[in-house]
């Protein structure tokens, strides 16, 4: 499974972005719970979800600060 692209996160509306952040946090919690109980078969999913969450939070922060990236960035 490839790493998610930040362009995908930037294409979301503000409401979709908030919903996606909530969904990824919930999924990350469930993955950590599975890891703690030794039921996690695909441990790489934790890394992918953390990466996606970081991208989503970065985009949210950019929007709050009013910074809109250009195509060169």
UniProtKB/Swiss-Prot annotation:
Biological processes, Gene Ontology terms: translation
PANTHER family: 60S RIBOSOMAL PROTEIN L35/50S RIBOSOMAL PROTEIN L29 (PTHR10916), LARGE RIBOSOMAL SUBUNIT PROTEIN UL29C (PTHR10916:SF0)
Source organism of this protein record: Synechococcus sp. (strain JA-2-3B'a(2-13))
GO molecular function: structural constituent of ribosome
Alphabetic keyword roster: Ribonucleoprotein, Ribosomal protein
Coiled-coil region(s): none
GO cellular component: a single term: cytosolic large ribosomal subunit
Keyword Secreted: no
Gene transcribed to yield this protein: rpmC
InterPro entries in the cross-refs: Ribosomal_protein_uL29 (IPR050063), Ribosomal_uL29 (IPR001854), Ribosomal_uL29_sf (IPR036049)
Pfam families: Ribosomal_L29 (PF00831)
SUPFAM superfamilies cross-referenced by the UniProt entry: Ribosomal protein L29 (L29p)
Protein name per its UniProtKB record: Large ribosomal subunit protein uL29
Keyword Ribosomal protein (UniProt): yes
Annotated family: Belongs to the universal ribosomal protein uL29 family.
HAMAP family linked: Ribosomal_uL29
């Amino acid at each position: 499974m490839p790493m998610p692209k930040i362009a995908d996160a930037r294409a979301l509306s503000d409401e979709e972005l908030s919903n996606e952040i909530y969904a990824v946090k919930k999924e990350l919690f469930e993955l950590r719970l599975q890891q703690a109980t030794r039921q996690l078969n695909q441990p790489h999913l934790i890394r992918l979800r953390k990466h996606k969450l970081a991208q989503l939070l970065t985009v949210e922060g950019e929007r709050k600060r009013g910074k809109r990236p250009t195509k060169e960035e």
